[in-house]
Amino acid sequence: MRYLFLLLLLTFSTTSSSVENVHSFIPGSMEKILSAREGKPFILVFWNLDCQYCPTELKMLSKLKLKYTDRLDVILVATDTLDDAPQLISRVKSYGIHAAEQWVFASSVSERLRFEVDKRWYGEVPRTHFYDLEHKRIVKTGLVDQKFVENWLDRNNELVLKRH
């Protein structure tokens, strides 16, 4: 009986800690993400569970994250809901990119969140933002080519090295 109780306790604590790793994307979250990476390049990917091309892009970014461990900072923002967090975690894990920081839309008015990110964004995914050192961004909608990401990484790595 004690073994069963311990097993259940471990199962539920693991599940809840996984969900806690997904941050609520609310008004002000975009600024929080940007300020935490001041002076650092990063990639911000908006995706959702129903997206046809998102698995391909997230798997590609996972492979690149292994190759460029120290140089590639990827943040994932799911445009689903907080209720979907367990499924989002499972899906991201299956793509191999579970080490990335994860957020999920947590407002009943998703248009407001999208507007805060980009006034010209109407919710299409995948939508990938490439932020350089000065946080000037390049926005790509649809599947991003691996060569584009590698070229972007090389350009930004050169700038990081010049700065130091």
PLM regions: where:
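Solvent-exposed loop/turn segments at secondary-structure junctions
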Residues: N48-Q52, T79-D83, S108-S110, H135-K136
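N-terminal "domain-start" segment that seeds a small globular fold
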Residues: T14-S35
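Sec-dependent N-terminal signal peptides
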Residues: Y3-F12
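Thiol-/selenol-based redox modules, centered on thioredoxin-like
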Residues: V125-H164
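Structural microenvironment flanking redox-active thiols in thiol-disulfide oxidoreductases
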Residues: T56-G96, S110-L113
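Short, internal strand/loop/helix patches
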Residues: V92-V125
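Short active-site neighborhood of thiol/selenol oxidoreductases, capturing the structured segment around
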Residues: A36-Q52
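Loop/turn elements at helix/coil->beta-strand transitions in domains of secreted/extracellular proteins
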Residues: R37-F42, D70-D73, H98-A100
